[in-house]
């Protein structure tokens, strides 16, 4: 058999974020769970990976003050926030045959923010 499991985490699960202990803990937990499942299910031909989006221009971000958004852009090597399609491409890749040997990975789609 074979299959794909693609979990959703967040870059804050990798680097932490002030004042968000509960959110950071759950997203870091998803990364750990992804690694364990990759080991357990890999023998059955199932790959397990995670996508960790960075700050992405969605409706949720519309309430963030422009000053904060500017600060995020300034800290991001690519100089912008992500678009939903940027995140979607990571999922498409992990679901594809081209990713058949990728297992236990967390892909950070963040424009380099976590470097």
Residues covered by each model-derived region:
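Alpha-helical segment proximal to the catalytic Tyr-Lys
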Residues: 39-43, 100
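Short, flexible catalytic-loop segment of classical short-chain dehydrogenase/reductase
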Residues: 31, 52-63
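Hydrophobic structural elements of the Rossmann-like NAD(P)H-binding subdomain
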Residues: 6, 48-51, 61, 104, ...
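A short C-terminal helix-loop "cap" of Rossmann-like NAD(P)-dependent dehydrogenase/epimerase domains
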Residues: 62-76
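Conserved catalytic-site region of short-chain dehydrogenase/reductase
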Residues: 13-15, 115
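Residue(s) in the substrate-gating loop at a strand-loop-helix junction
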Residues: 10
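Active-site helix of classical SDR
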Residues: 26, 34
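C-terminal helical subdomain
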Residues: 50, 74-98, 102, 111
